[in-house]
């Protein structure tokens, strides 16, 4: 697999990032927090989202205020080019391949694309064999158990472990099936006995069915004759009962009709009496009709007249008052015009006084700005003048101390190089002395055991002295570097010092400028100007108010004309109403009121009698309707009387033809025969059902007997399969251990070479030993094996890195891509330089390597350098030149 290009949009600090990768070593470099590791996380999300990686959640990587995360990965696998695109926010995804001319879609949708990628390169293979993550070195150094877990994941030994466990599950499943079959065979041991018992029961049931079947036709024939005679008697009894009920009903109807006839005759008499009374009332009503009409006409006029006069009187009073008020306001306007002229003259004088103060006001404004600026500058000055001078002296002292420290560190580095060279020579001499025979490889004379021992002791003592001096140098270097950090902190304050000095100079300049102004005089001028402005504003407000009122003068005159017109119209309306009163023959309202009082009794009697006409009409209609009802009821009584006579004759005839005793006798005989027949039929049905059940049970038992034979054969096969599965489990376990030991032996050899490079051959090898659920790691020093506790902190990190690189290099024949995320944490400067040589020597065996780091030294080993920086909160990617 080879990664060609990665496009990232709105992922953490990346707004829109495009990264191109090539064959060889690709280095992604940048400071912590610049977004370089986010490129690797985006690659994982692009390939395996949504279920992998599990520790990445959508909210963790979506860019704030972004339009939505999108990732596109272009890569090659098996000489075929692919691209995977994911739009996380919208839940869209696709994978395409290039057929040589254009891109063709393979899958769409987040889950289908993830499943396709999982088949092409399983996530566990990518994460364990291809991707060396931050913190994985710590897991290698943490314990023998955690180291074994890393080895198991990277080498893919989990597959064999899972196979071993899965085979145990298979064996358990086979055991469960064996037990189930054995239980089944035991539970069906008596099947032949059950078949014999059911065959006997079937013979007995068939015999009883043959005895009952002939009796049923005879009983059914006898019962049919009785039921026919019984049916005829029941029909006669039913007709008799129906005739009696109908007769009783008709007799009741006849009584009701007679009662209705009497009621209607009584109502006719009462209605005729009311009709005569109402005719007299209608005559009186007609005699009062003329007076009633006059009363209604005069009453309407009186109501309209009084309402109109009252309304006019009220409006006349209102409009008269308005006219008086308007005339007074118009008279006041001339006084206000004179007042406006006085105020304008006063305003002109104030404006002249304010103009004379203009220059002083401008000077006062400039002085205020200088004072405000001085206040701001003093707030920015965080140190006093004495403290600034003290800080300047500290920085000068720190600059001198830094030169001294750098010079001493250079001397320490030079001395360490000399000691390493001597130690290398002594180690080489020791190795040669241990292997040498005959002549001494040091001096060339004959090599005796005494001479060998003497030289070995001498060189070993020298190596111990060198080691002690190296530790002292390392201790001194550590102390100097710690001091250098503090010195650098002081030197970083130099920029702050420059800024403070500049602020101090600005304060002095501002104070000098302020001395040029007479602030007391300028403040008095400003106060006077404010007072004048206040007076001027008051005058302008009063002038505007008066001018607005003067403008309203014409409107007031127009309004007065309208009010006077309205008063004339109201007077005319009042005169018109009085004219109508005279036309009716009345001199004033009192005469009209007296005439109404005179007509009122006749009008009230008229109102009282007015409903009589309608009542007379209703009563006459009712009388007519009652007479029609009476005629109809008389006809119905005659008809019902005839029906009652006919029904009485029909009942007498039916009573003569019906024999009640014979009816009861037939009921008893029919019931007895029906019960006997039902009992035999029920018994026959029960026997037939039992016959069918026994036959079905026999069929099932015979099938069960055949099944028993098949199960017995299956049991033998399962027992043999269990033995084969157990043998296969043992083989899988043995092969896993063999593979693990062989792989760790090769990994140990490669780790030894890398570790020797990292420690400049201080250690002559790395030991790797596999145990149950453990992998022990050690080093060889001066021919002896030591545990990890023998190593310094930096050497432990170097060993962990060497071991993890060896694991990936072991798989180099199977993988074409390796990713390292921050491989240099805790490595000192010298070991980082050694790592560059290791990358050039070993990692070039892998077609494509992607390294993420903040160490500039790694650039020397890279074929392509991609620099990541954070600018205004956004990650920016640039390709850098390779030296």
Swiss-Prot record:
Source species of the chain: Thermococcus kodakarensis (strain ATCC BAA-918 / JCM 12380 / KOD1) (Pyrococcus kodakaraensis (strain KOD1))
GO molecular function, one term: ATP hydrolysis activity
Family, similarity comment: Belongs to the SMC family. RAD50 subfamily.
InterPro entries: AAA+_ATPase, ATPase_AAA_core, P-loop_NTPase, Rad50/SbcC_AAA, Rad50_ATPase_archaeal, Zn_hook_RAD50
Entry's free-text remark on domains: The two conserved Cys that bind zinc constitute the zinc-hook, which separates the large intramolecular coiled coil regions. The 2 Cys residues coordinate one molecule of zinc with the help of the 2 Cys residues of the zinc-hook of another Rad50 molecule, thereby forming a V-shaped homodimer.
Record domain Zinc-hook: where: 395-492
Cofactor-binding details, from the entry: Binds 1 zinc ion per homodimer.
GO CC entries: DNA repair complex
PANTHER family: ABC TRANSPORTER ABCH.3
Protein name as it appears in the record: DNA double-strand break repair Rad50 ATPase
Gene: rad50
Stated role: Part of the Rad50/Mre11 complex, which is involved in the early steps of DNA double-strand break (DSB) repair. The complex may facilitate opening of the processed DNA ends to aid in the recruitment of HerA and NurA. Rad50 controls the balance between DNA end bridging and DNA resection via ATP-dependent structural rearrangements of the Rad50/Mre11 complex.
Family matches, as HAMAP family: RAD50
PROSITE patterns named in the record: ZN_HOOK (PS51131)
Family annotation (Pfam families): AAA_21, AAA_23, Rad50_zn_hook
